[in-house]
Amino acid sequence: WEDYYKAEQKKWVLYTEGLSDFDILKTFAGKLEYKKAVEILEGILFIHPTGNNVPDDARKHFYGLRDAVQDLKGIALFDRIDKQLRAGQALTEMMWKKREIENYFLCEDVLLNYAGDTKDNDDMFSLNDAENRKIAMKEAIDEVAKALKTLGKNDIWSPDNKATDDVLEPVFKKYSEKLGLPIVLRKNEYYKLAEFLPKEGIDAEIKEKLDAIVKIADESKGDTNE
């Protein structure tokens, strides 16, 4: 019943595969200084993580709610999938042009910036450690790139790779081994890497998807305060 209550209150719902996708969207909105999108995503909204990229599952949930809340609107964001999405419906369905949302911050500079991050600690030991971490990360990246090439796979930075499974997981496994540490960043934490992508590196498609979210939110007549 909680979902019906949220649907009645908000009048719109956002579907993503997981909460990390939502966190990445929030990070990008902040970096772009897209105030309306930040206001919406930082507010109390109705988000429903589907746990998969199956459009029928999002549709079933949405239209089940819409039977009770007939003015409900929604937007669903999917990874690039081999499924036909529907257009012109109460549920706006969109997919990423790249394999998944993590591909939009997948680049060497982001990983090196992450490895070299000293946060607020800039003493000499931390700076030396940061350089060593960057060296370890570069070695990990090069080893994974070489392995992919040997296996006849895509280039490591290809938008057709599944960024999480094909690149980030093996890179962080090797990186952690080189540092003699347990895995330092796991799949449900990859969203943190988006912080290390500069504003000018954000793909125009991100703004397009944020525009679509803002449009749906603006068209709804829900309560933005509860």
Model-predicted segments: where are they?
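C-terminal accessory helical subdomains adjacent to catalytic cores in phosphodiester-
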Residues: 84-226
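RecA-like P-loop NTPase motor core
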Residues: 1-84
